[in-house]
Each structure stands twice: as C-alpha cells, then as structure tokens.
Curated annotation (Swiss-Prot):
5-phospho-alpha-D-ribose 1-diphosphate binds at E116, D117, I118, V119, T120, T121, G122, L123, S124. Its cofactor is Mg(2+). The keyword Cell division does not apply. NCBIfam families: pyrE_Therm. This is Orotate phosphoribosyltransferase. The gene is pyrE.
C-alpha cells in the first residue's frame, strides 16, 4: 500500500481536513487527519491494518504481542494484531504516565510491536515504549498508520509507518501569518479528561 493509497482511504472517509488545527501534541497544523472517520468503517480499517501488519513482518519480523496507547491506538492496534495473529493489549494513562491495567501484562522478553494511529512528535510512542520496557518487553519496533514527521521523528526503536508525510506543525508562538489568520479548531484528545 502506497502513501497515496493511504491518503485515498482518508479522503474517501472525509478524514483529510484543511484549516488551522491544534494537534494533541499542542502543535498547530494546516492539515488534520481525522482518523476516527477512517477507523469507524471496519473494512477500511482492515485494509490499512492488514497492510501495516505485512509491512511490520517484512521489516522487523514476527512479534509476540502488540501493545498500543489508549485511546487512539486501541483500534489500529487490535486490527493490526489480528493480522499478525498475536494478542493486542494496551496501556492507559495513570498519574500522568502509561501503565498496564485491566489484567494486561507482558512476559519478560516478549517481542513487542507498539502500534499507534498517527505519529507527529512521537511523545505518546516514546511513553508507551517506556512502559513496555519497564514491564520487561523487548520492543522490536513502533508502527503507525501515518507518520506526520516524514520519517524525522525518533521514537528510540525502528518506526514502521504505512504512510509517511511531511506535514508542517508549528508551536503557537511561531505560526506563519497565513495559518495564524485562520480560526483555530482543537480536535486533539490528549487534553480531554473524562
């Protein structure tokens, strides 16, 4: 599956948006990928995650388990794990850091692929990887549907992405004038508290 194939899935779902967005990282961007509109259709999610699973195996080999960060990584993590024929578990934020809960755990030395939806700065990926390593897992790779950094982000392990884009993202104090002139939308989820 090519970058264009992945973007076609986002376009078909109405999930490739243009405007002025505050991402969950806190950065501002003229492009937002509304992944939930993609993942709400099982057939679309299946196509993307099957291709991601194939790329994981071709790149780093077969993992023993897939671990994802809640909430955004749960659906692609589960579907990718299905195609890898491994268990899918996730970590949740507790006290500001990711922890294994709900009876989820790793066996020491298990080969783990960390599966995300979209990576921009890699913060959630690095935090999830740290939780996996703390629990005794061996992280053989991180994987995502879309890498918005164009391959520049460093998560500390190989990053396998189905689609790599170089999408501009800016701190609030360094916005280009054309982006600053557009009203802000804040679709990110990291700051939401239930």
């Amino acid at each position: 599956m090519t970058n264009d194939d992945v973007l076609d899935e986002f376009r078909a779902a109405g999930a490739l948006r243009e405007g002025h967005f505050v991402l969950s990282s806190g950065l501002h961007s003229p492009i937002f990928l509304q992944k939930n509109l993609v993942f709400m259709r099982p057939q679309r999610c299946e196509r993307l995650c099957k291709a991601l699973a194939e790329k994981i195996i071709a790149t780093v080999g077969q993992p023993d388990v897939a671990v994802s960060p809640a909430v955004g990584g749960i659906i692609p993590g589960y579907e990718t794990a299905r195609w890898l024929n491994v268990a899918s578990i996730y970590v949740e934020r507790e006290g500001g850091s990711f922890k294994f809960r709900r009876g989820f755990h790793l066996e020491p030395g298990q080969k783990v692929v960390m599966v995300e939806d979209i990576v921009t700065t890699g913060l959630s990926s690095r935090e999830c990887i740290a939780a996996i390593q703390e629990a005794g897992g061996e992280v053989i790779a991180a994987a995502c549907i879309v890498d918005r950094s164009g391959g520049k982000v460093d998560v500390g392990v190989p990053l396998v992405s189905l689609c790599s884009l170089e999408v501009p993202a800016y701190p609030a104090d360094a916005l280009p004038p054309e982006l600053a002139a557009i009203p802000i939308e804040d679709p990110g989820s990291r700051r939401l508290r239930g």
